[in-house]
């Protein structure tokens, strides 16, 4: 199989969008600013919150979906033993070493995962998937060609995973899907939500004609309208639910109407899958060949994301 440059690019793009979120870290987490003796940090402007909210709707679903795709690609070609060894070196050791480094910067060891939490959860998915992949029935289910009806059912499930995550996390408040802080702070709802996208990536590996269909101009136009409508409804829902919040940094301590929270969660689920499919289609249409620039971007995106936090905070502090 030739290298899929469209998916390489999209995975790297999703990872690098984390820099756009973390660029405002001093405003989102005042405790970080306090460590640099910066007090009275104002809350982020609304446009900053809008950018963070928009990117957060699709970034991690896209990342885990493509991780599932590339996982089964390697597993199918190289075998389980090679696959697990490779992922332990590339993902698990990177997570452990760099998370440890970031953890001890404040002088204490709290077993926090920092911004590398997704590597920790991805390694859990990889180990679990490697085990269940040995089951013949599971292999047959995920490797079958899916009909439009089955694909529609999968989409519905992915939409439901967001409100389901709220329920599983026993948390009918806004930031129920916030990442875990430590290795021991895993949230069942988050795992179900992200693992569902991981499995979707596996299914797409066996149904790669879907990429061509999503790249068709008429499908892209339809998806773009659906995405815009979905996000407009999400903005309106968020305004109804959280419009009275004066400082979003204290949102975890506030209570909201459970019905509005669940509606907002459904809309987030719709946005997650719609934007994910749209971005796959757009990448498939625009990125069709290799180039030196693309290789550079793909190769550097992972190490840049792993180490970017400290340089970014230092630069933010200097220009604060």
Predicted feature descriptions by range:
Residues 1-320:
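Alpha-helical transmembrane segments and their immediate juxtamembrane cytosolic regions
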